[in-house]
Amino acid sequence: LLHTTQTQACKLAVQDIHKRYGDNEVLKGVSLNANKGDVISIIGASGSGKSTFLRCINFLERPNAGQIVVDGEAVKTKTDRGGNLEVADHKQLQRIRTKLAMVFQHFNLWAHMNVIENVVEAPIHVLGVPRREAEDRAREYLEKVGLAPRVEKQYPSHLSGGQQQRVAIARALAMNPDVMLFDEPTSALDPELVGEVLKVMQKLAEEGRTMIVVTHEMGFARNVSNHVMFLHQGRTEEEGLPADVLSAPRSERLKQFLSGSLK
């Protein structure tokens, strides 16, 4: 277990996460600590466990073992008969999840709601923010991600992928989270739209947002993160400062990955 003093400095402490599907162990003890303002990029080949690890942080995937501490508060778990973790207090998890906003690879906007409805839905129904206040804030966040006021009444199907992902980022910001989790936020986008989303993410990093980003964008990992983790076959093979990890890789696997042979 983590010492209290250690967790207080941390916005997020993830300890020794294990996850398996049947006999296939996809995470073999992965840990991460994020202090306020950290931008941590998680890189690795397909199947290395990056997205599974990210989804275990907010229990979208249930880890088989490990501990997650958000802003000094450990997610309460118990062990079931099979020796796997179960959530012990669903109300607590719900509350902790409001501190962890997730931005998905495929945007996950509600198709039947227009842009502003997508952004205000959770603040109104989960946080209890009055509608007018939620809408005012939503407009601020939409402006922050570079979307014009005329977009707010449009439906997701009428927007480009880049616009949809920026709405998804505005929706995450509207929850005023402690930590933002990004699961390959640009990999479903056409190449010419990637830049507009990365620009928004860079702006958030410069504002001091705490961000955990699973990404294939090495430029972002190098220039925006202050820490990079390289996952290989469910373990952290190498981690550290971007300049060290990406410019002077020590492990053969990371050298191969960066040269493109594992991509």
Model feature map: region roles:
Residues Y155-L159, Q163:
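Conserved ABC ATPase signature
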